[in-house]
Every structure is written in structure tokens, then in C-alpha cells.
Amino acid sequence: MSKLTKKQKKIAEVIKPNQLYTVADAVAILKQFASKKFRESLDISINLGVDPRKSDQVVRSSTNLPKGTGKTVRVAVFAQGDNAAKATAAGADIVGFEDLADKIKAGEMNFDVVIATPDAMRIVGQLGQILGPRGLMPNPKVGTVTTNVEAAVNDAKSGQVRYRTDKNGIIHCTVGKADFAPEDVLENVVALINDLKKAKPASSKGQYLKKISLSTTMGPGLPIDISSIPV
């Protein structure tokens, strides 16, 4: 059996088995173990009471986090004419049409979010094998296929997170950085859960929010007391 590292020993001393934490307490503990070399993200995992094998129980949506993610987001927009001008004015990093598709096919992927107007989907659809596996394919359900490109760019830049249940019925997303104030993280978590409740499939029965855990990029995951979240 391998020996525990100094960090692992400290984690074992601080984190109590089978204990549930408030968001504030979890953030305070995770801050202790966060890297000093880079800003670690605070990530949340929420186990939902859905059957992801059923198409009508797949939860896919987006949330505008009131306190943002702490990350600089690069946005690419497929649009032309007035919509292209609006996207550029809103702060999109890359705007194009067929030329943007050619860049992506050539391997230029310097962006985190892709937005497209409906008329651009005939072009974007050809990029499914490139964008899809990276979670970048525009989708109307999360607001990335839209005629209102200005609002979509603003949302993406200001802290919108997109999520979809995985094969185990769990959604994963970022709710801030390890150096965020606990109250800011809580505000983001509340916004996320409220949106998840609105997105609950009608066919989902029983307990919907089953388990929640909070972790940093390189740190442990802490189970959260759902009843302590004011939603």
C-alpha cells in the first residue's frame, strides 16, 4: 500500500467521513487545499433523480451565474450581415460564416463557446464531428442557436454555464473559482439549482435532487447538505 502524501494526510485530518457540509463550509475547506500556482475552478456535481436512458429525462439547459465563473470566455459566432456586426459589437472574439467553418476544419479551435444564427446551422451542421465531442455544438435548448446573438454573446461572456446529464444522471459544471467568497459561490449554486428545478422532466418521479458535491480542480469532493441551500 502506497504512503499518503502530506496533502492527502491533511485532507484526511480535516474532512470527516459521512459528514455533509454547507456550501460556505465546503468552500472554506477547499480553499485550504487549493493550488497557489493557478486559480483552481470550483466545480459542482449534482446527481439527479432521472433515467438518462430515456430521452425525455435528459436534462440539458444553461444558467447565467450571477457572480460569473471567474473565467475569461472566448466566443465564436457563426453569423453574417447585421447579426455579424451585432456579435462583434457585443464582444465576440471570432465572427464568421463559411470562413469560420474552414478555420475550424483546419484545426483552429481557440474558443470556449460557439453561437450560431439559425441560418448558419446548414454550415455548422457539417462540423458536428469536430464540435460535438468537445461539447461545443450550438443548440437552441441552451440558447446558442439564436437570432439574438448580442444577448447570447453577453450571456456567454458574463458567466453562463451549460450542462447536460451524463450517462449516470449527473450534471457537472463550474460555479466559480477557489478564491471566490463563500457567499458568491452560494449565490451561483442557488441560481443553478433553481434553473435545474425548472428543467425537471415531467416524467421524473421521486426525489429530484439526490446528491450534490463541491470540489476544486485538483482537490477532494465534499458532499453538500442539500437542505442547507436556500432554494
Swiss-Prot record:
Gene Ontology CC, one term: cytosolic large ribosomal subunit
Repressor listed as a keyword: yes
Pfam families in the cross-refs: Ribosomal_L1
Gene3D superfamilies: 3.30.190.20, 3.40.50.790
PROSITE patterns: RIBOSOMAL_L1 (PS01199)
Family per record: Belongs to the universal ribosomal protein uL1 family.
Name under which the protein is recorded: Large ribosomal subunit protein uL1
